[in-house]
């Protein structure tokens, strides 16, 4: 139960988990729909007492004073637990009620189609008022007229017969009030059962419009758990790029992927497909929460915890996969120029520590939920965090320039808070480099002061206080101050400090490399090489390459196709296959250089190697791969193929974005066709 103190760290979420309020008796019946709730079965005694108490209260208050006492009650028909001899052929959607006053002691009258004469029930499916302890089998010899009461006829109003009344009662302070909205879609749902309860999952609301599902392009399934053969162990440095959105992480990762070969570096992009297409779109949920939800609500903090867990799930699994690929009993060594690189976009530090800290400071995440997320943080030896940052104005300009829908709610203040939270996490790690985990725990628990710790460890008090006051450790100390004697709280704090101290940080200011990506990579490379604490691990490079290839294929193919895009792509592939077949069967002579190219296409020949090549077609910023056999094409490719490439590139939008991001849009192994934003093609030697 929730605490009654003014600092309530664990408020129950009644809106989400439906926690009953036992001290408010009337609230148990506020939203009860008596027409759809099944009658209480005769074998339950705990649930009958509150219902009978309400019934007595309503009868005493005179809700139905004219109702004569009855000797018998109609047999109950429990839709959830039907008797064995019932035929499951009730027509529940035909609800005919009498026009007289509503009573809790009299259930609604349902017309049954079991028999021609009327109702049919087993002898144990009824109860006699005032004699609940009598064995029901003793009334088996009663006639049907003595056993059942006579049902009065319905109203003679034709409109009532065509449209039977469907009342929905609810108890509020001893009175009955109608809630017609409860049954707005109930008859349609009952009618969808087709008078059968055997398949309740086929019910559908005919009044509601079904949501349109956009078809998505599902990438080919490449299992990363398959046997990849003999492992290939090499020394590799594992680096995780972190920082605010649009700080330059993905740009630097793509530069490393394009510049370095697969034998030198492997890159793993953000798991964007898992965040946007698997089960739910967590980016859209975050936007909705920031627009609609208010700080301080328990439902808001519950939704944010769900979102942060989804952000953290793929990041944790990637880190665990890399840890499993480390060779057992291998020692870490300092990084060298000939070592390999494993570069990952995002670490679980951002999903479980940094962004929850931002949300908690904004009042949207409770202290309890922030502390629970903090306890899930995990790091491994050898992991390096490359913290990248730019100034706020440059970061905001980049963010608005790329124009993502999920980032429209981000303003300058939000960017400042994210940068401050990353700086706070870095300062917490830096504090652990000066002080031991035990000393940090004593300061957070209030068992020791910062002055005593500085005197014991021999650290300058000015430096230590400046790092300590950077809000991360101060905030954590304030959160656990009232519960510092709890052993679970102590274990969570100790585990967080030990995991955080395992990491290694390098900070890169990209403000000086605005249009110089190679310079930014050089700055990152030199900082890693000069840091003697950064170590390499002996890792299975074959398994990591399989993970990287799968991650890139999933990242590049996660796109929703429209009908025009699918049609244009199919038309282009058919044209390409036809022209390629013509070139194979009847090779055309080379065109003269004086031939005027159509649509701005150059007529320079394209030399294709005799081996197979991969044609990469860009669809709105992503790649779609098609393998074409070029064995028989020796010297020239017909001009129509180049024109088809040019025409296909203009079918889709964001060509300028694609060109700036990937540069080489279409390529044949070692020679490529570059499509620029002015609408012309040129052959480029790679």
UniProtKB/Swiss-Prot annotation:
Any GO molecular function: ATP binding
Q: Which positions does UniProt annotate for substrate binding? A: 308, 404
**What GO biological process terms does the UniProt entry carry, in alphabetical order?**
DNA biosynthetic process; TMP biosynthetic process
The annotated region (Disordered) lies at: 1-21, 64-85
Q: Which UniProt keywords apply?
A: ATP-binding, DNA synthesis, Early protein, Kinase, Nucleotide-binding, Transferase
Which residues make up the binding site for ATP? 243-250, 398
Q: Which is an annotated Pfam family here?
A: Herpes_TK_C
- Which SUPFAM superfamilies does the record associate with it? P-loop containing nucleoside triphosphate hydrolases
Q: Where is the composition biased (Polar residues)?
A: 1-14
* The protein's Enzyme Commission number: 2.7.1.21
- The catalytic residues are 270
Q: Which InterPro entries match?
A: Herpes_TK, Herpes_TK_C, P-loop_NTPase
Question: Which reaction(s) does the protein catalyse, per the Swiss-Prot or TrEMBL entry?
Answer: thymidine + ATP = dTMP + ADP + H(+)
Q: List the HAMAP family.
A: HSV_KITH
The job of this chain, per UniProt, is described as: Catalyzes the transfer of the gamma-phospho group of ATP to thymidine to generate dTMP in the salvage pathway of pyrimidine synthesis. The dTMP serves as a substrate for DNA polymerase during viral DNA replication. Allows the virus to be reactivated and to grow in non-proliferative cells lacking a high concentration of phosphorylated nucleic acid precursors.
State the oligomer form and interacting partners. Answer: Homodimer.
Q: Which family does it belong to?
A: Belongs to the herpesviridae thymidine kinase family.
Q: What is this protein called?
A: Thymidine kinase
Q: Which organism is it from?
A: Alcelaphine herpesvirus 1 (strain WC11) (AlHV-1)
Q: Which gene encodes it?
A: TK
């Amino acid at each position: 139960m929730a605490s009654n103190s003014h600092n309530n760290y664990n408020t129950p979420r009644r809106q989400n988990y439906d926690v009953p309020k036992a001290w408010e008796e009337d609230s148990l019946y506020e939203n009860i729909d008596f027409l759809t709730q099944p009658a209480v079965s005769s074998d339950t005694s705990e649930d009958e007492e509150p219902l009978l108490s309400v019934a007595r209260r309503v009868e005493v208050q005179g809700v139905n004073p004219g109702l004569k006492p009855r000797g018998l009650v109609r047999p109950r028909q429990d839709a959830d637990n039907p008797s064995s001899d019932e035929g499951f052929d009730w027509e529940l959607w035909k609800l005919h009620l009498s026009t007289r006053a509503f009573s809790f002691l009299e259930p609604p009258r349902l017309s049954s189609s079991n028999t021609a004469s009327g109702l049919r029930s087993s002898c144990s499916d009824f109860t006699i008022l005032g004699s609940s302890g009598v064995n029901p089998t003793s009334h088996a010899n009663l006639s049907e007229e003595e056993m059942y009461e006579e049902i009065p006829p319905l109203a003679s109003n034709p409109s009532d017969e065509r449209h039977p009344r469907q009342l929905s009662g609810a108890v509020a302070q001893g009175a009955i009030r109608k809630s017609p909205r409860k049954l707005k879609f109930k008859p349609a749902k009952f009618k969808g059962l087709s008078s059968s309860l055997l398949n309740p999952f086929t019910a559908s609301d005919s009044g509601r419009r079904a949501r349109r599902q956009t078809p998505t392009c599902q990438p080919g399934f490449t299992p990363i758990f398959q046997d990849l053969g003999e492992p290939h162990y090499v020394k590799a440095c594992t680096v995780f790029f972190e920082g605010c959105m649009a700080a330059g992480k993905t740009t630097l990762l793509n530069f490393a992927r394009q510049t370095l070969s697969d034998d030198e570096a492997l890159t793993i992009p953000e798991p964007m497909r898992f965040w946007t297409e698997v089960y739910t779109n967590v980016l859209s949920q975050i936007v909705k929460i920031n627009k609609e939800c208010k700080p301080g609500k328990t439902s808001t903090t519950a939704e944010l915890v769900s979102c942060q867990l989804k952000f953290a799930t793929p990041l944790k699994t990637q880190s665990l996969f890399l840890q499993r690929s480390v060779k057992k009993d291998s020692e870490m060594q300092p990084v060298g120029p000939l070592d390999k690189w494993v570069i990952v976009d995002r670490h679980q530090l951002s999903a479980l520590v940094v962004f929850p800290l931002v949300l908690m400071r904004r009042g949207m995440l409770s202290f309890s939920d922030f502390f629970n997320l903090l306890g899930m943080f995990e790091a491994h030896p050898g992991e390096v965090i490359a913290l990248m940052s730019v100034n706020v104005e440059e970061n905001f300009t980049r963010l608005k320039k790329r124009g993502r829908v999920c980032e429209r709610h981000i303003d300058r203040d939000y960017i400042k808070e994210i940068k401050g939270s990353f700086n706070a996490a870095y300062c917490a790690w830096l504090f652990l480099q000066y002080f031991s985990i035990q000393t940090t725990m004593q300061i957070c628990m209030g068992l020791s002061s910062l002055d005593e710790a500085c005197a014991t460890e021999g650290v300058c008090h000015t430096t230590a206080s400046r790092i300590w006051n950077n809000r991360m450790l101060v905030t954590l100390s304030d959160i656990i101050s009232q519960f510092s004697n709890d052993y679970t709280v102590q274990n969570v704090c100790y585990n967080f400090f030990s995991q955080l101290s395992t990491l290694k940080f390098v900070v890169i200011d990209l403000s000086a490399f605005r249009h110089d990506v190679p310079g930014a990579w050089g700055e990152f490379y030199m900082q890693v090489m000069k840091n003697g604490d950064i170590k390499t691990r002996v890792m299975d490079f074959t398994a990591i390459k399989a993970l990287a290839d799968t991650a890139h294929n999933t990242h590049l193919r996660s796109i929703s196709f429209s009908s025009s895009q699918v049609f244009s792509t199919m038309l282009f592939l058919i044209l390409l296959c036809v022209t390629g077949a013509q070139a194979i069967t009847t090779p055309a002579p080379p065109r003269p250089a004086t031939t005027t190219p159509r649509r701005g296409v150059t007529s320079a020949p394209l030399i294709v190697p005799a081996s197979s090549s991969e044609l990469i077609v860009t669809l709105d910023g992503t790649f779609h791969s098609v393998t074409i056999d070029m064995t028989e094409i020796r010297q020239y490719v017909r001009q129509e193929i180049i024109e088809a490439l040019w025409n296909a590139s203009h079918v889709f939008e964001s060509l300028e974005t694609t060109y700036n991001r990937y540069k080489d849009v279409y390529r044949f192994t070692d020679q490529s066709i570059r499509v620029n934003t002015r609408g012309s093609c040129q052959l480029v030697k790679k």
